[in-house]
Amino acid sequence: MKIYLVGGAIRDRLLNIPVRDRDWVVVGIRDPKEMLKKNYQQVGKGFPVFIHPKTHEEYSLARTEKKNGVGHTGFLFDFSSRITLKEDLKRRDLTINAIAQDSSGKIIDFFNGKKDIQKKILRHVSYSFQEDPLRVLRIARFAALLSHLGFYIAKKTLSLMKLICSRKELLYLTPERIWKETQKGLSTQNPHVYFQVLYSCNALFFLFPEINYFYKKTYFLNSFIKHINLVQYSLIELSKISKVTKDINIRFSYFLQFFYYVYPIPNIGTKDYFFYKKPAFLLKKMLIRLKIPKETSEIIFFLCGFHNFLQNINIQSSKLIIKFFNIIDVWRKPNRLNQLIYLDFYNFNSLKNKKNDFFLGKLLKYMFSLIKDISVCSFIKEKKFKGIEIKNDLNRLRIQSFKEMKEKIILNIF
């Protein structure tokens, strides 16, 4: 039995970037029970993966794969003792991830991964690459992860990604798996690259059809900005916001705000000016389909629906501002305001004079600070109301207090 360090740990070390986790492959083991005898814990259904009792790192048995179905899970695995290290590495996605190291520290590189690291190329190991649709998302993620180092996708690899998409195998990926890879893509230094790659290989059409639909469309906004591509501009904005915050909820919701501009409000006097349902509910359908976590979904939903209201928060009535605070439940979740402050970056209608100083967000936080202490508990001590009476009277008190403080707000901000 031999054990080798494989994959990302070696790649990252060769790139001189921090090693996040280490994975191992076990070659030549006759009976998987030998691992259990050494106190490893077995996980995984399709093939045995063992967790080290002390380091908690993953040890996988060397294996080969044979396509026998569709999607990411349609494979038969052979993890018998005759499987060699080279056979195991050959099934991996990229050459830069198919490098191994033995116990003496010797690097084993059957597929020229080191050479591709030097050339900064993301290249598939073999043509079996095309059998797993998840690899389309993985390569998009690696492109985003390593783009700041100058890495790019090899032409033949991109062609195989397009081939996978043309076979419609992406449709067999579970929403959970799509979101997991997207989450990782959003966590990189350049998350906009993730979506650009998905579009370039036609994967966006299957994974995010709502975004893909608007990718090439241009829109008339005003006399100063006659035509703009909303999605591509939003990707530029996503790149900018990613330099300011690592919060993926902010990054993703910030990017998706372009949906608001797809459907211009027909009449400024309508209630849509407060919360614009049409783009918000289009987004909501996508969020539900992809089973995106509730907290992330709510932030995206609020930012899109309340986009215009928040862009004009300085002229809103006290009643509407308190109503907004109630809807987003800021009394129990004040951190949501810390996510909303980034809205000041994103305003198509002021592209020429954008200072990006978070003025609107600061104003919003200041407004909340003036009335946040008017809580249910403090109110109950002074009033003897019950049930809905408490809610209604508390709301009236907040609105009245806010009206009285409006002049103070203007003086402090300006």
From Swiss-Prot:
One Pfam family this sequence matches: PolyA_pol_RNAbd
EC code(s) of this entry: 2.7.7.72
EC class of the enzyme, as a word: transferase
Keyword Transmembrane: no
InterPro entries (UniProt xref): CCA_bact, NT_sf, PolA_pol_head_dom, PolyA_RNA-bd, tRNA_CCA-adding_enzyme
NCBIfam families: PRK13298.1
Protein name in UniProt: CCA-adding enzyme
Organism name: Buchnera aphidicola subsp. Cinara cedri (strain Cc)
Organism phylogeny: Bacteria, Pseudomonadati, Pseudomonadota, Gammaproteobacteria, Enterobacterales
Gene: cca
